[in-house]
């Protein structure tokens, strides 16, 4: 007679709660370390700063706010945090989610109400991406509010992978080596923008947001109509990372390791003076091409 065996244990069962907690603690510690390092490296926060944390309801901005709150508890300098959200009047936007969450954690906050949705959908031709105009209008509204409230810094939730993707978008589509700096002054000179997640990977943010169970709000305006160029760059980067793990981190490090003399930007390095052995003025391009130019104009 065949023996009767108990059912086999599911070897793919979820990890034990203790192990999950340990992994989550390690992840939170890594993120705090990376955010703290970025703040220190780029001088993002100083004593008595009044920081406006831009909260969209996405994983990145939730993680940004959470990290800043954790770091502030033991920070070497005092600073204030206020969460600010722009209600763009998108149809179906759950207006209650952010205020309820922020109130539950005792976070000072303000909701700016401005109908940019109607403007963007009216102005942008059908079939075109809405991202560019939407971003400009959102930025304008946030900057205006920051100015009226006297905020000294504006914190955004862009992370390491965003910065790398922006670099390649500018390289591929605009023929320039520029990106998304961890800290910058706005074009009008009135605001200092900081990106404390500059060293944090998107993979870690996804894992952290999932562990913390943030009430994520999808963007109905552009979430389903992702910017095509950024999406294409994202596909390339993910393929590189899959084939060569650590590739994105290496690229991110390269953004802070520039060698102007080994590029070709004449405004950053004086190639004219390199190796000169006299003070005689150098002939310009017109002089060097005089023969060709003469031939071009010949009958």
UniProtKB/Swiss-Prot annotation:
It is found in: Cytoplasm. A motif (PP-loop motif) lies at residues 56-61. It catalyses: cytidine(32) in tRNA + S-sulfanyl-L-cysteinyl-[cysteine desulfurase] + AH2 + ATP = 2-thiocytidine(32) in tRNA + L-cysteinyl-[cysteine desulfurase] + A + AMP + diphosphate + H(+). GO terms for cellular component: cytoplasm. Its cofactor is Mg(2+); [4Fe-4S] cluster. Its EC number is 2.8.1.-. Binds 1 [4Fe-4S] cluster per subunit. The cluster is chelated by three Cys residues, the fourth Fe has a free coordination site that may bind a sulfur atom transferred from the persulfide of IscS. Belongs to the TtcA family. This is tRNA-cytidine(32) 2-sulfurtransferase. It comes from Xylella fastidiosa (strain 9a5c).
């Amino acid at each position: 007679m065949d023996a009767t065996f108990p059912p086999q244990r599911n070897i793919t069962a979820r990890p034990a709660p203790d192990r999950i907690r340990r992994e989550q603690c390690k992840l939170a510690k890594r993120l705090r370390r990376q955010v703290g390092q970025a703040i220190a490296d780029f001088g993002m926060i100083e004593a008595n700063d009044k920081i406006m944390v831009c909260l969209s309801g996405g994983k990145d901005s939730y993680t940004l706010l959470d990290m800043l709150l954790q770091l502030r508890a033991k920070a070497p300098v005092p600073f204030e945090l206020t969460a600010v959200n722009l209600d763009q009047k998108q149809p179906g936007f759950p207006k209650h989610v952010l205020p309820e969450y922020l109130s539950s954690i005792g976070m000072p906050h303000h909701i700016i109400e401005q109908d940019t949705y109607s403007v963007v959908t009216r102005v942008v031709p059908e079939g075109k991406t809405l991202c560019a105009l939407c971003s400009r209008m959102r930025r304008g509204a946030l900057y205006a509010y920051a100015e009226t409230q006297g905020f000294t810094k504006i914190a955004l939730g862009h992370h390491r992978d965003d910065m790398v993707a922006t670099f390649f978008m500018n390289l591929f589509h605009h023929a320039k080596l520029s990106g998304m700096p961890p800290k910058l002054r706005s074009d009008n000179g009135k605001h200092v923008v900081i990106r404390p997640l500059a060293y944090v990977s998107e993979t870690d943010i996804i894992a952290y947001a999932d562990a913390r169970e943030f009430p994520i709000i999808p963007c109905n305006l552009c979430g389903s109509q992702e910017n095509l160029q950024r999406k294409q760059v994202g596909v390339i980067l993910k393929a590189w990372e899959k084939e060569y793990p650590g590739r994105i981190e290496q690229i991110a490090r390269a953004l802070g390791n520039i060698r102007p003399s080994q590029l070709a930007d004449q405004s950053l390095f004086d190639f004219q003076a390199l190796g000169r052995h006299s003070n005689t003025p150098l002939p310009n391009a017109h002089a060097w091409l005089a023969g060709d130019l003469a031939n071009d104009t010949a009958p």
